[in-house]
Amino acid sequence: MTEEDRKLTVETETVEAPVANNLLLSNNSNVVAPNPSIPSASTSTSPLHREIVDDSVATANTTSNVVQHNLPTIDNNLMDSDATSHNQDHWHSDINRAGTSMSTSDIPTDLHLEHIGSVSSTNNNSNNALINHNPLSSHLSNPSSSLRNKKSSLLVASNPAFASDVELSKKKPAVISNNMPTSNIALYQTARSANIHGPSSTSASKAFRKASAFSNNTAPSTSNNIGSNTPPAPLLPLPSLSQQNKPKIIERPTMHVTNSREILLGENLLDDTKAKNAPANSTTHDNGPVANDGLRIPNHSNADDNENNNKMKKNKNINSGKNERNDDTSKICTTSTKTAPSTAPLGSTDNTQALTASVSSSNADNHNNNKKKTSSNNNGNNSNSASNKTNADIKNSNADLSASTSNNNAINDDSHESNSEKPTKADFFAARLATAVGENEISDSEETFVYESAANSTKNLIFPDSSSQQQQQQQQPPKQQQQQQNHGITSKISAPLLNNNKKLLSRLKNSRHISTGAILNNTIATISTNPNLNSNVMQNNNNLMSGHNHLDELSSIKQEPPHQLQQQQPPMDVQSVDSYTSDNPDSNVIAKSPDKRSSLVSLSKVSPHLLSSTSSNGNTISCPNVATNSQELEPNNDISTKKSLSNSTLRHSSANRNSNYGDNKRPLRTTVSKIFDSNPNGAPLRRYSGVPDHVNLEDYIEQPHNYPTMQNSVKKDEFYNSRNNKFPHGLNFYGDNNVIEEENNGDSSNVNRPQHTNLQHEFIPEDNESDENDIHSMFYYNHKNDLETKPLISDYGEDEDVDDYDRPNATFNSYYGSASNTHELPLHGRMPSRSNNDYYDFMVGNNTGNNNQLNEYTPLRMKRGQRHLSRTNNSIMNGSIHMNGNDDVTHSNINNNDIVGYSPHNFYSRKSPFVKVKNFLYLAFVISSLLMTGFILGFLLATNKELQDVDVVVMDNVISSSDELIFDITVSAFNPGFFSISVSQVDLDIFAKSSYLKCDSNGDCTVMEQERKILQITTNLSLVEESANNDISGGNIETVLLGTAKKLETPLKFQGGAFNRNYDVSVSSVKLLSPGSREAKHENDDDDDDDGDDGDDENNTNERQYKSKPNARDDKEDDTKKWKLLIKHDYELIVRGSMKYEVPFFNTQKSTAIQKDSMVHPGKK
């Protein structure tokens, strides 16, 4: 079976480990380093564990060595464990059984026959009560433990349960029956039976056979009780020898198997079985069962018979159990040599170190809870000292680890007491809220509870002994130092809070993976907290817990003597991929919690050029070089130690540094988190948000104040990937944590700083969360799923006083786009000044063609005051402003082209005066146009009226003939309108009046002038004149209608007088054809009597001559003869009628009346 068959990629709702004191080591003098080489027992199999078949050849020798306390050498241990670990026959075919409980085949034979009897292979209540026994739920661990909901996919595997927990569970017999579950009683009796039978007993070898087999084949794994708060950490399988040349996979450290839900199921089985069979395997003495070694175990069922006696026996047995537990430390020490870890996961920190940190953290709780038991603590301390002296010939590492393991048993009582505490109201409220969110399985919001692990807190920092660490560094050869490569992973895991919710339970059963991380595996910190250990113990521990990063190193370790193995211990500190490394032995390296949450696969996929190391002048500033084959690192002259800055540390430092720029409180704390601020149990704050899991909202919003760069932008990632994961010199990704950040261990006093020779860029650590910067992290979010990447929002005013930006040669490139491309190293712990540009700078480019071209990415300009303030702030942060003796601020290395980062939210907050005037003119023009249009329209409407005072001034130029009458007419009028008015249509009647024409009743007309002359000749002249005068005065005047004129020859035009208010005069001519005829009259139906003849009517003369004839009626209608008689004498021409015209824009027809008469003298001029 190959390694690929042993791996299983599972995706589950991951669980955050309870944030208690056991996550990180504290400076407790009573904490004893545990023995990572001692495997611990478990009552059930892990979800992905590997069961090992009993091998008589491989386990017989191991079992005998364990029982008889033989002390083989480290070389033999390693060889035996290596041989067993690569034997494929030791693996079951069903190595991935999830949810199965321990069967009778997994229990030793003697334990099955003598003490337990029979064990049920199934648990009927396991599925229904899974939520109640699930260690992921809050009521099984610390009530204030936090959970987190995240989704990821990693390669995980776990170790089976170890049987050496028998030694751990036998220490408190008097308290076991009352405070511990029944499964631990079964383990207790197993341990006691192994000790009673002796080294040569067959049942003892059977009891510890599985423990030896497990310890030789897998890395060690500690086991805690139900109340343990240690997070799980799975172990990855070791590849076979045939796969050494294949690319290595960096795997996670060890995982405590007692924190999985399958263990609880198996332990529930043992509870039921042991309750039935325990009385058969013990003898009764004084109303209580007695173990095989004589120790008394009080029986809880007999407590009602004699309550007072049981209390006294219980107190007595507590003290005896304490003493005997500490006395047995020498026995347990012997098992550590055979159960030492064979290998460690590739590319990760030592499994034994992770085990040390986890067990020591559990012992911290043990020490705190056992302060009430003065006698027990004194006995334990005395036993520790005695154990160290007794086992002086044994390796000091085994003594240290065994003493630590003996103190671990006190957790049974303490964890049970912590579980019995009632949850607070805040916990109940959080559980109800989580249940309400989880019940809606098809909810669109996907709300989750987010908890922040206390592993990143500064109060849990470990301060190792720097002198011992420097001594180890000097003793290590350079080539061996370079081969040590550790990758720490934060113990930060999450899962939904389960409170009797079947829907969430069904989700948890699905094939999902558990994302776990290693606890800080620093043995130096553990040893430094124990004053009873000497310096040799630390060196021997380093031998056993040295990280074997490659398979080919195993053979060299087996062949080297122990004193050579002591020189291969690297500095004990967790490394993260993007952390900072330095080899300065004089610097005080402080171990901090890791700040990267990288996935397993991502560690092997980091770009090699980002992890390259540089060296100059013997000093090295290097980073872990992860190659594709993971065989060897690039050679360096000195070993590189790594310092990891935690998220909270960076946050606190940035808050102190940026205290002048406003409130630095975290804005995402909500009302739910405030409830937990008053939690006396020290539970971490909860942050609730409605964003999806893959969005790290806090890292996305909380950007630095002085760096307007946007981390993990889409354009930057695509630009980076399209150029083979390299950035050219012209790009400004200053402040980005996607590449290795380097500093000098925080030593500002070191003036002789090394100079970079081949790095393309330099970066300084920022105060942002590091999750968003690791492109291979499972918590990384690159914003590509968003609609649009939005840079930092900033509001800047307009630059009224434009100075350097208006220069024709001004460029908008970044600091790295300069011609010199000078890379300055930070002096006194600070970086040189940089141009405060954003991630859009690469769009502008570094060539000369784009220097003077403004495009959409060109940012807005700042005001002079704001620009000066921005330069000062950036220089203060970068360390480029130095105070001289006169307290004058000198700006060095400040780019004059510092510009504000581009943002779509930037706008000009105040408009210039020219813009104001321009807008005013536009407004005035619009208003004036409207007013003028209204005024004109109103004026036209007001002035467009009919003609006023129309009058015919004169009629002259009269031409009289028998066929035609033509005369000119002159008309004057006043036009009040703006436009002229023309008149062409008229209706004029023309008359002629004469006194020389005398007509009788018949219509005959004669000229009275001729008759007068005849009378004057024949008669008296005086009488003739009198008779003529009487005729004229008597009305003998004839008026003849000549015709009607309808149209003027030329129209009359009257100009508008709106402005000059003057009268206008127009002249036209009237033409009348055949005057007096029927045609001329019938043009108009009016029959008016016109006087057209100039004749004098005489009495009786004309009437007698011109009598009417038979055709007289026709002659009336035809006055042509009269007209012919009239034109011989003077006559009067009369014109009367109307003139018609139209007013402009109204199209209404108007008319006015006219009248005019004139004397016509035909024979005169």
Curated annotation (Swiss-Prot):
Compositionally biased region (Basic and acidic residues): 413-423, 1111-1121
Subcellular location: Vacuole membrane
Cell wall biogenesis/degradation in keyword set: no
Region of interest (Disordered), residue spans: 118-147, 215-241, 274-423, 461-497, 560-668, 1074-1121
TM stretches of this protein: 920-940
Biological processes, Gene Ontology terms: 1-phosphatidyl-1D-myo-inositol 3,5-bisphosphate metabolic process; positive regulation of phosphatidylinositol biosynthetic process; protein localization to vacuolar membrane; regulation of phosphatidylinositol biosynthetic process; vacuole inheritance
Ranges facing Cytoplasmic side: 1-919
Keyword Membrane applies: yes
Biased amino acid composition, Acidic residues: 1085-1100
Biased composition (Low complexity): 334-345, 375-391, 469-485, 562-571, 599-613
CC terms in the record's Gene Ontology section: cytoplasm; fungal-type vacuole membrane; membrane; PAS complex; vacuolar membrane
A Pfam family assignment: Vac7
Phosphoserine modifications at: S164
Membrane topology field: Single-pass type II membrane protein
UniProt keyword annotations, A-Z: Glycoprotein, Membrane, Phosphoprotein, Signal-anchor, Transmembrane, Transmembrane helix, Vacuole
Biased composition (Polar residues): 216-230, 346-367, 393-412, 576-587, 614-662
Protein modification: N-glycosylated.
Residues carrying a glycan: N1020, N1099
GO-annotated molecular function: enzyme activator activity
Chief place of localization: membrane
Parts of the chain on the Vacuolar side: 941-1165
InterPro entries hit by this protein: Vac7 (IPR024260)
Function of the molecule: The PI(3,5)P2 regulatory complex regulates both the synthesis and turnover of phosphatidylinositol 3,5-bisphosphate (PtdIns(3,5)P2). Positively regulates FAB1 kinase activity. Major activator of FAB1 during hyperosmotic shock and can elevate levels of PtdIns(3,5)P2 in the absence of VAC14 and FIG4. Directly involved in vacuolar membrane scission. Required for normal vacuole acidification, inheritance and morphology.
Quaternary state and interactors: Component of the PI(3,5)P2 regulatory complex, composed of ATG18, FIG4, FAB1, VAC14 and VAC7. VAC14 nucleates the assembly of the complex and serves as a scaffold.
Name under which the protein is recorded: Vacuolar segregation protein 7
Organism (species): Saccharomyces cerevisiae (strain ATCC 204508 / S288c)
